[in-house]
Amino acid sequence: MNAAKVLEDLKRRFPNEPEYHQAVEEVLSTIEEEYNKHPEFDKVNLIERLCIPDRVYQFRVTWMDDKGNIQTNMGYRVQHNNAIGPYKGGIRFHSSVNLGILKFLAFEQTFKNSLTTLPMGGGKGGSDFSPRGKSNAEVMHFCQAFMLELWRHIGPETDVPAGDIGVGGREVGFMFGMYKKLAHEFTGVLTGKGREFGGSLIRPEATGYGNIYFLLEMLKTRNIDIAGKTCLVSGSGNVAQYTVEKLIQLGAKVVTMSDSDGYIYDPDGIDREKLDYIMELKNLYRGRIREYAEKYGCKYVAGARPWNEKADIALPSATQNEINGDDAKVLIANGVFAVSEGANMPSTPEAIRVFQEAKILYAPGKAANAGGVSVSGLEMTQNSIKLSWSQEEVDEKLKSIMKNIHEACVQYGTEPDGYINYVKGANVAGFMKVAKAMMAQGIV
């Protein structure tokens, strides 16, 4: 395989999809050496088959707002690869959603799900609809209209969506209710459900908790204790909230959180009481993070991200490409020695190069934030056997999965000088499992 040639061909065939191109380039550049040890892969054009989704559904979503006006949005579902299990990946509702972003997310999801060792393929879906500023009734009407098309393409053994940005328990509940009505069956077709109707304990916390469990494994490789360390967290949604919660439990000091308008810097640290306020502000009132600064009298910086502040550890938990090369240099200059990604692809290629050249601990999202989909997989298992596990059981399984992912990254990513290239390790480990499954199943 010539990675540059494969990427050039994909850009020609699928122009105007920069996030998708970026994700493919990052993976190909790290697996090329291992791939070329297997000439049998090229004989069946494996890499092209793996880069291009199995299928893409694109549809119009028509719904009525509270004023009686008819609105239209675009809906999508990218079913990328099901070589190792049913398609599995979240649904994102955000004004920035387009096909290129969802193809990147589905591509990444394929390798992330492979890393968990659970039987899940990769997919992703969503819409350019944004729940922000919408009433509860409007969100329900949209979710029902969205599921009116999506339901025919998903199923517990076919494709199992979950939440993502803009899609929390409320939205999953609305979509599940509509699916149940259309399909005339109660089944585990969505994960992230409420506990009352098939959801799993620890699922809301899983991505944030899992990221910290992975971070702890990384820190062990350098004999570093997380207690007392100053942490920068971006975002204030589900992932960021539970990242902060686990950090507080472990004795770390979190000084930032953010949203799309700006970030807060609290030098005293965000404690349990302050985090409870943020959770209520964001989850119940759909408020803005600046209200935290007004309540607690700390610094608020509008229109910026929190990467200029001094800290030991950075945990980007908001969105893709939120850390660029210049941000990465500032983080290192300000003392950051570990970056663990809670969001999907939050660091640009230039930022990743800066981190790796500085030899700091850097964990890509496909490894570090795999906790969310791992517990989604555990929710699927509980649904299939019609049982619920305790919080302790699920949490222990999550810790074990994140430890195993870390071990796989170390196995495939340790370089001659001893530095662990977690990007390479995650990509090669995830790729090899999918590649072997595809080879065994023939040309399909």
Question: Where are the language model's segments positioned?
Answer:
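Adenosine-phosphate binding glycine-rich loop
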Residues: 1-23, 218, 317, 332-444
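Flexible, glycine/charged-enriched surface loops at secondary-structure junctions
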Residues: 21, 37-44, 117, 154-163, ...
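Structured beta-strand/loop patches that form or line metal/cofactor-binding pockets in enzymes
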Residues: 40-71
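Phosphate-interaction motifs
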Residues: 59-120, 124, 128
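Glycine/serine-rich phosphate-binding loop and adjoining beta1-alpha1 elements at the start
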Residues: 94, 113-227
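Glycine-rich phosphate/diphosphate-binding loop of Rossmann-like nucleotide-binding domains
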Residues: 191-194, 199-310
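Rossmann-like adenosine-cofactor binding region
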Residues: 262-362, 367
